[in-house]
Amino acid sequence: MTDEIPWGPTGELVYNRTYARTKPDGSKETWPETVERVVDGNLALVDRRHMLEGEREDLVRLMTKFKVLPAGRHLWASGVKNAQHLFNCWVAGWPEKISDHFQFTFMRLMEGGGVGANYSNHYLEGYPEVVNPLRVEIVCDPEHVDYQAMKDVGILSEHYSHDWAGAYAIEDSREGWAAALVDLIDTHYRPGTVHYQRVYDVSRIRPQGAKLKTFGGVASGPLPFAVMLQKVANIFSEYAGITLDGIAAMEVDHAIAQCVVAGGVRRSARMSMMHWDDYQIDKFINIKASTGEHWTTNISVEVDDEFWRLAKEGYGSFAVAREDMPKQKRAHRVLKALSEGAVRNGEPGMWDSSLSNVGEPNRVVCTNPCGEITLEPWEPCNLGHINLAAFVTPAGKTDYLDLIRAHRLMTRFLIRATFSEVADPKSREVLDRNRRIGVGHLGVASYLALTGSRYSEAPGDKRFTQFLREMAAEVDSEAERFAHDLRIPVPVKKRTIAPTGTVAKMPGVSEGIHPIFSRYFIRRVRFNLNSDMAELRRLAAEGYEIEKDLFAPNTEVVSIPTKDTLVQAVEELGWDEEIVESADELTLHQLLAFQALYQMCWADNAVSFTANVHPDAYEAEDVAADLKRFAGLIKGSTIFPESSFPQAPYERITKQQYESAAAKAVEDGVDEECANGACPIK
């Protein structure tokens, strides 16, 4: 059966590591078994009378051959009894009680999802002042397996015993951990508090290394959670007598994410945003460099129509009113920071809230961590993808009939997914109201090359732009038909482009709409020490370079010399490899033009796209000029310089360097990190 599955070079490895579930007999699923589980689980979400004739068979066929692929969370959780957590990422809002924000963030991250939040201070200014400074005291039964480790690092209280009846006993569950966090935060705001030591008993928390069944991975033990409680208490205590501001709230969420990343399979994924005219915007933009922290999040600046109006005009322009000049100065300063960050290390990114809110029934406030879906507070993203490259015939033509069928079926798949359970009533309300879905494309660069087209020429190719509009119309019409059949609102928006990092690796096609990074490169893959040790040992035995991750705990980095698989495919067709254009052969203008093409002709949601550039090829002024040129045409931007930090996800090498390494060609050119064009959330 394996030979019949069109795996990419590392596709089976990625599947076995990420999506294959353990069966009752202890063996792992095969890909056909996963497909049947996913399809049957999805179809069971609505009454069978709403199923099309042959719909199950078509979905199984298309998914088995990697022609359609739902987002990784569907592959992992669809059809799993009592664990159908089908949504990848969320946006956390700012409700009446501030602890609800942090509880929501903690719960979604512990479930393996990603969380975005907008930390602009106008969202926090209505909260009351922090009342009480508190000191967290941690106690634990000496019989606990991790007791000595906690004692050795000095986390345990010297003043309280685990036998004290007044200690808060933390239950060993996600809900129990979140409840303790809420208790701590609410105590900071509770008038009349007499005792400023809050004692938490972690004796019931399972020890480090215990297996986690629902979401995979292993337990981190009580230590990271205890550290988080102390960090959170320290942050709130610093604000006793004043209102928590956006930067402080961001620090709390970072502490929460650090706790989550300490155990389990996945790294935490977050998006942090702040409005360009916020009084803390300069501190926000420089927060990673100035603190050495906040590695759990991507950061983006929220801009809007006013920002572009002011940024496009020169100082002293008669088009800018005198009272707007201070704002204009800030707009120019922020644009300069965006542009300098792009050529320095890729951050911050940019998100256009004015353009993103066009067509929205209610205000969207942030994106998911990878930036392809703009969301209301508490709303999840719900993604599925069409692999365009899989519909190219051996003659280099497009199988339009099957491609149209694929777009329609993925639309129906995602609408059904909106009926799945969610843990938070706030999310249920917005999900029922919006029914937002995100049908996307992957393998786009592969599709263009395999049909004889150059990536750089696509924005000016009327046939390709018409093709995108026709496929978009198929999604929209099917969404309307199916929603009416189900008697639910038509999805508010339906089409997107996601980075598709992990799922694209299974068929081995280009990720999302990205060009290949380079024909030859070193790709660095992150592995979790707790859950991926067997694979790490195998790769070490094969001679790959392995080193500790400099940024994330419990993680090792494997360096793999790689020849891009698309180059191989083109060579096998007898074509010149130069029809495959890599990122280093494309200008920033050409890259942003391709993003704008997909934003205008395909996506009503957003387009997640990383323009990878050589840092020596562009000055900040060049980036600013292109950002202004594409203002109003793209909803966000991430411009990322190659090799901008140690252990960069990819590093360009020459053909000669690749051949001298005598390495097996294993993958295409974009890594799994959100900030660099792909997503770690499965």
Curated annotation (Swiss-Prot):
It is an enzyme of class 1 (oxidoreductase). The keyword Oxidoreductase applies. It catalyses: a 2'-deoxyribonucleoside 5'-triphosphate + [thioredoxin]-disulfide + H2O = a ribonucleoside 5'-triphosphate + [thioredoxin]-dithiol. GO terms for molecular function: cobalamin binding; nucleotide binding; ribonucleoside-diphosphate reductase activity, thioredoxin disulfide as acceptor; ribonucleoside-triphosphate reductase (thioredoxin) activity. One of its GO terms (biological process) is DNA replication. The active site is at C370, E372. Its cofactor is adenosylcob(III)alamin. Disulfide bonds join C89-C381. Keywords: Cobalamin, Cobalt, Disulfide bond, DNA replication, Oxidoreductase, Redox-active center. Its EC number is 1.17.4.2. InterPro entries: RdRp_reductase_class-2, RNR-II_ins_dom, RNR_alpha_hel, RNR_lg_C, RTP_Rdtase_AdoCbl-dep. Belongs to the class II ribonucleoside-triphosphate reductase family. This is Putative adenosylcobalamin-dependent ribonucleoside-triphosphate reductase.
